[in-house]
A protein has these predicted regions:
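Conserved active-site tyrosine of GNAT-family acetyltransferases
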Residues: 2, 102, 107, 129
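Short hydrophobic/aromatic beta-strand or adjacent loop that forms the aromatic wall/cage
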Residues: 22, 124-128
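Acidic/histidine-enriched, glycine/proline-rich intrinsically disordered or flexible terminal extensions
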Residues: 135-142
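Conserved catalytic-core motifs of GNAT/GCN5-like acyltransferases
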Residues: 41, 88-91, 108-125, 134-135
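Acetyl-CoA-dependent GNAT
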Residues: 3-61, 72, 132-134
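Conserved acetyl-CoA-binding loop-helix of GNAT-fold acetyltransferases
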Residues: 58, 64-81, 96-104
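A beta-strand edge to alpha-helix "cap/lid" segment located at domain peripheries
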Residues: 72, 82-90, 94, 113
Length: 142
């Protein structure tokens, strides 16, 4: 059964992001968190050091206000500034709004994992979208 995180759990997660140096952008409307975006390591192996997996979340009360796009633009600029080569988005196949935003921002479809997750009493397919950048001028060998 899917369990929502408590405020304390989410705050600890935010703190861990800060401690690890991973970017975390929060969209605030009148003191209320309307959304956030972050990225972290795609895989915990040196060969993948230039690839990140991102997350973007917008509260349902703030859908269709352009918040996800604004947050994603911030993440993309941060990734470029940090020599990221590839940014990966892993999206529930049924989340067409997120897929459309990613496509609008230049992400391209790169694959599907069927039945990758189980949530809300059903199996979910996961689609991968990626955006490639120049990356580092002199990448380090793993």
């Amino acid at each position: 059964m899917y369990k929502e995180q408590t405020l304390e759990e989410r705050l600890r997660w935010f703190e861990q992001k800060q401690i690890s140096g991973e970017p975390l952008f929060v969209f605030d409307i009148n003191g209320e968190v309307a959304g956030y975006a972050t990225y972290g390591s795609f895989r915990a192996y040196p060969a993948y050091q230039y690839t990140v997996e991102h997350s973007v979340y917008v509260h349902k009360n703030h859908y269709k206000k352009g918040i996800a796009s604004k947050l994603m633009h911030s993440l993309i600029e941060e990734a470029k500034a940090n020599d990221v080569k590839t940014m990966i988005g892993c999206i529930d196949k049924e989340n067409t709004a997120s897929i459309k935003i990613h496509e609008k921002l230049g992400f391209t479809y790169s694959g599907t994992i069927r039945n990758a997750g189980y949530k809300f009493g059903r199996w979910l397919d996961l689609v991968f979208y990626q955006l490639d950048f120049e990356g580092p001028e002199n990448p380090l060998e793993s």
